[in-house]
Amino acid sequence: GASEEEDVDLSDILAGVDEGDVEVSETVGSQEPVDLEAQAGESPVIRYVNYIIQQAVKEGASDIHIEPAEKKLKVRFRIDGMLFESMNPPAGMSAAIASRLKIMANLDISERRVPQDGRIRCTVAGRKLDLRVSTLPCGYGEKVVMRILDTRSIQVELDQLGFGTNTLEVWKAQVKNPHGIVLVTGPTGSGKTTTLYASLRVIDKNKLNISTVEDPVEYHMEGITQTQTHERIGMTFAKALKALLRQDPDVIMLGEIRDHETAHTAVQAALTGHLVLSTLHTNDAPSSVTRLVNIGLEPFLVGAALNGVLAQRLVRRLCEHCKCEEMPSEEMREYLGMQGLPCESMWVGKGCDRCRSTGYAGRLGIYELLAVDDQLRDVIARNPNVSEFRRMCLERGMTSLRQDGLKKASKGQTSIQEILRVTESSI
């Protein structure tokens, strides 16, 4: 990274950057993409912004943070869930870079006092990308954060996400059920959307009517009707869902269950012969049941409608080029022994040029799948205490997030340290 260097000489960097490298589909007045290359006499700012986006894509970043400080401007990329400082343009470019990004995202360039949100559609190295742009006024100007939505990353299949064979089979059966609710749960950025889209792909869209309600529609999928919510004009999740139910749907994907009205409508849909897939923000699978009851649903309805809950996290994958086995500490050996895992050696990433000296490259999912059977339906109907319910699920063979992660660490897919970092001891 450039974190140790002084302000860089732009002309050196920009020598190799062409205006056409990032082709922005500007939507000014019309939907016709405007090729930036055609706009002659480009200023260094335009080229530098192109350079930032290009570098981020090249390094596999999911987000770009442009952060003005008193005497410097920091550009950080989020790679595999971690932020890395990537470049330090001159502090004086802060306003110009923010303005350029606002123009690209069709935002109000003169408004610097309130946050703004927009989106940039562009092509980088032949790849079509969507950048979600968010600006925020702060002490030294405006901070700009961009989320890179790469349509390729969402085209992964279920069996590429890191599921164990058994979990994968059970989950596929869940999403092929003709009716009921199937949930994916986890914090923001844990890969829920990717799992939902991959799950929709195993359903036969030629024979079934599949519809989604999302906020916003992140990726467009062929053969599926996708609807975006607009809270400001009253197009809420609940309202969109009610409208969808009049469209003779078979499968409905809801971006998120946020409130009682949406939850209630989703349950009614599930109980009247529709399959509903959605997400929640809970730490583990069993606590999703409690969350639905807390939203205001009757426990017996939750028990009747719920088919399965998949809790997930993303963990960093060990770099294939520098991973190796080493002897665990005494304390770690004891811990591994208690978990019933091999304790003579453990996998670690040494760090090399290929992985920015982190020891990790790429990510995979760890999962906890709760499949609801008749016995559990009866338990849920009695509104169990959450820790008691969790204990019961584990006793009946549910693999916890941490157990799934430790299994993957013992196979050398990730490290034990990474699993302990991402999961809480209770899960």
Range-by-range predicted roles:
Residues 1-142, 149-154, 158-159, 165-166, ...:
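N-terminal, intrinsically disordered, highly charged
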Residues 64, 101, 131, 174, ...:
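Residue-level signature of catalytic and energy-coupling elements of molecular machines
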Residues 143-144, 265, 363-368:
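Cytosolic catalytic headpiece of P-type ATPases
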Residues 168, 172-182, 193-316:
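Switch/coupling sub-region of P-loop NTPases
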Residues 185-186:
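The Walker A (P-loop) glycine that initiates the GxxxxGKT/S ATP-binding motif of P-loop NTPases
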Residues 189:
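Walker A (P-loop) phosphate-binding loop of P-loop NTPases
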Residues 282-373:
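Cys/His-rich Zn2+-binding cysteine-cluster or related metal-binding knuckle/ribbon modules and their
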Residues 339-427:
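NTP-binding/hydrolysis catalytic cores, primarily Walker-type P-loop NTPases
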